Structures are given as C-alpha cells and as structure tokens.
C-alpha cells in the first residue's frame, strides 16, 4: 500500500499540488500540509493560512541555510523536538511581509538560484526549518519528510509546510478523523513519514559495518560492533550475552546513549545514573547498548532526553542487527507511541522501561 501512496504523492508534488504528511499509518496523529516551494503562489499560501491555520514554514537543506546566511533561531534548542528553526525572514521588497502575496514573494525568492542573503530582512514572517542531512533515515520529522518528498519528485528540496489545526484551534489527536476528512474534502493525498522511510530503505543505506569483535566492557565479555554512517561518524554497539533460557532472545533490551564528552556526562547526574542502571540491567538480562555519535550541535546539553524523532541511525542499527521487536530502556518519560514512524524501519517497540 505504501508504494501506491508514495507514487501518488510524488506525482502530486510534481504537479504543484499539496499533500498531507502524517507520521504513521498505524495511528491517528497530527498532520502537515506540504507543497514544493517552487510551486508556491499567493492563493496556495492563503489556503494554508485559512484552512490549515498553523505556522507557515519553509523546510530547506543545510546547504541552502548556509548560502542564505540563515543561522539557528537560538543557540541552545530546548524545544520538545529540537525543530531546527532558523531566524525568520521577509523579502527585502516586502512591505509588512505578512500578506499571502508577500509571504509567497519571500518563499519564491528562497527558491531562486541567484538569491543572496542581502535580498532578505530579518526577522520576518517566513520561518525556515533546516532538515537533517540524510532526511527521514536520520530524523523522522515532518521537516525531513517534506524535503525528501521534493527530492523524490525531482524538484528543488525546498518545501512549504504548515500544521493543520481544527476550527476550534486544537490539533487533531489520536482517534480523531479530522485529517482524513480534511484530505477528502480538499482532494489531498495523504503520505506517512513511514512510507518515505520504507521507500528509501529499498534503495539507500546510510550505514556500513566496519568491525565486529569480542571485547570486555564493564567487566563483561561482549560483542563489539562498529558502524560508520553517511557523515563518517562512528557508532559503537556492545552486545551483552542473553541470560535467559533461549540463546535467541526475541525481544532484546536496547539502550541508546548519545556520545558526549566525559566531563559533560559526569556533570549530568541524572543521565549518568540512568546509563549505569541500564548497564546493570543489560548485564543481568542481556541486550544491546548502542552508543550513537549523533548528538545535535544545537541541543541543550542539560537535557537528558533528546528529540524522540532523531533516532533514524539507531533504528537502522537495529535493522542491521536483525532486530524487529525490542524493549527500550529509557530515562525519558512519555509513552512508547511517541516514537514516530517506527514501522517504516520494520521495528516494533514492545515495551518502554524507565531507568
């Protein structure tokens, strides 16, 4: 089914139409209205403002952000999902910048190849978002999904994106048919982040295994596996022997840990204690400790919980280990349902255990 959805979404984007992007087919969730930036028009921007009602943003690549001199909005991003907002902008020729015509002017200017940083004023009424390199295979966010679908459609990787709100100002929640009805009413195709993940995994691989060896870790004989990603960053996995009745544990314990400096880790007592508790649990029951070298340079180092969408490399590591069902050892609150688009990686989070 995902093949049909992604084919229809690609064709819609090519034709300048809008689509709705949601997280996962298996659950009702919030959705964003998305179109390719090169097909922006005042009428489409007005439709987003009137019908979708959310914040109109433009998802771009890191390369374009650098070209247009768009630095992060803040140096320490402590929003829930670490959405990579840059400083907001308006076209220099705009008067107020807020009208649909002037927001469209700003967006189209961003899409032109000869545009310079001096063509904009800051702050403004258009909010650029920087997609992570590697797209949804690194971060399963709508920012990355909207850039990825433009790439797949063969158009410039610049997308206009707007959250869809209900008329009463609330977001559509789980079990709410609002987004499906909205799509039907406006003849819009629905695409899931998990669809893009599955599609891209058929053709792409951001990881390669470079070593697999025996090693002693924290006094335990483990299997040490080292992977390297598309950005030449190394990620290390320690496999603790299973202590149960079967040598093939079907639902292994998994602990992800972002690599940071020793001093930074020691200064964060909560994270240090959670790591030690996880290691003791893995020693007792077996499983995998995955050290991810993906910590965001803009993240607030005081946070113990990173972006729950920012687990794409970890998910690909689990796939390479042959894991489908797993139990997560986590120091973060929240439900296991918060982990977006896991089905795209053919993964199932059976249980989440707080440590």
From Swiss-Prot:
Name of the protein this chain belongs to: 3,4-dihydroxy-2-butanone 4-phosphate synthase
- One annotated GO molecular function: 3,4-dihydroxy-2-butanone-4-phosphate synthase activity
The annotated pathway is: Cofactor biosynthesis; riboflavin biosynthesis; 2-hydroxy-3-oxobutyl phosphate from D-ribulose 5-phosphate: step 1/1
Q: What ranges does the record give for the region GTP cyclohydrolase II-like, renumbered to this chain?
A: 203-355
Q: Member of which family?
A: In the N-terminal section; belongs to the DHBP synthase family.
Q: Recite the UniProt keywords alphabetically.
A: Lyase, Magnesium, Manganese, Metal-binding, Riboflavin biosynthesis
Name the needed cofactors. Answer: Mg(2+); Mn(2+)
Q: What does the Swiss-Prot or TrEMBL cofactor note state?
A: Binds 2 divalent metal cations per subunit. Magnesium or manganese.
What Enzyme Commission number(s) apply to this enzyme? 4.1.99.12
Question: What is one Gene Ontology biological process annotated in the Swiss-Prot or TrEMBL record?
Answer: riboflavin biosynthetic process
Q: Which reaction does it catalyse?
A: D-ribulose 5-phosphate = (2S)-2-hydroxy-3-oxobutyl phosphate + formate + H(+)
Task: Cite the source lineage.
Answer: Bacteria, Pseudomonadati, Campylobacterota, Epsilonproteobacteria, Campylobacterales
User: In its keyword annotation, does this UniProt entry include Endoplasmic reticulum?
Assistant: no
Where is it found, in Gene Ontology cellular component terms? cytosol
The record lists Mg(2+) 1 as bound by 28
| Record carries keyword S-adenosyl-L-methionine | no
Give the EC class as a word. Answer: lyase
The membrane-spanning stretches of this chain are none
Domain of life, per lineage:
Bacteria
Enumerate the residue ranges of region (DHBP synthase).
1-202
One Pfam family from the UniProt entry? GTP_cyclohydro2
Q: Identify the residues that bind Mg(2+) 2.
A: 28, 142
Annotated function: Catalyzes the conversion of D-ribulose 5-phosphate to formate and 3,4-dihydroxy-2-butanone 4-phosphate.
Name the NCBIfam families for this protein: PRK09314.1 (NF006804), ribB (TIGR00506)
Q: Which organism is it from?
A: Helicobacter hepaticus (strain ATCC 51449 / 3B1)
Where is the site labelled Essential for catalytic activity?
125, 163
